[in-house]
Amino acid sequence: DTIAMLGAAASGDLDVLVLLGSDPLSDVPDADLAERGLAGAGTVIAVEMLPNASTLAHADLVLPAAAPTEVDGTFTNLEGRVSVAEQKVTPPGTARADWMIAAELALRLGADLGVESPESIRAEIAAVSPVHAELTETALADGRVEGVLISGSSIEAPSVSASTTPANDSYSLRLVAARRMYDNGTMLQASASSAGLAASVKVTLNPADFEKLGLDAGTVVKVISGRGELMAPLAADFGVPAGSAMIPANAPGSNANTLIDASASVTDVRVERA
């Protein structure tokens, strides 16, 4: 529970916060909470391949992690398909696999995770995860289909109780924070071929809302919520529901997470001419 952990850190109740390939300042929906959490933690340890905003501003210790092509392991996608990843190159310098770093960190903090190899980790995953119950070393070695093993277990959607959200005010729009394929992500920006593909932030509304606001596409506006504000040009898209404002998360220039309070079920915003 990322929000709960950051809340505990912000309150001074978390002695050590470990960031495993994580950039809370950019990725957590509530930027204010992320900042307070990182600042309030006793010690921040980052396990990272590349520097990011959170590690540069708050990490007390950075442990270099190996890239996926530098370690052995498996990947599980949302369909339950398990792909085998084999080490292609040697990690540079002192970089190590995430599980090695986690095991040694645990020992330094007084706990033994009992893992010594990727095989021992897969055995534990198979023991605790029904989806991976058939994930044996034999299945991985003999049951590949074009490099992919499909788990025999089905994934059931968790039951979630319905919650009520407050109604829109007559002057407000409901914020939709959207993810794009290309953004300010650490690995994307570290690649010269993909760094320039992230589009700058725009506030996208349904054309039906433009007349109500007295604004036109291309107008630079200020978007205000109870948490913060940002400035960006307007854009029109019939795909955005009327009464909503779509703003990309972690886009160059501004981030929708500056507007969001993670403790609230929804975020309503006001849009006005800048």
Residue ranges and their predicted role:
Residues 1-94, 101, 108, 122-274:
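A cross-kingdom feature strongest in bacterial/archaeal respiratory oxidoreductases
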Residues 113-120:
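Flexible, glycine/charged-enriched surface loops at secondary-structure junctions
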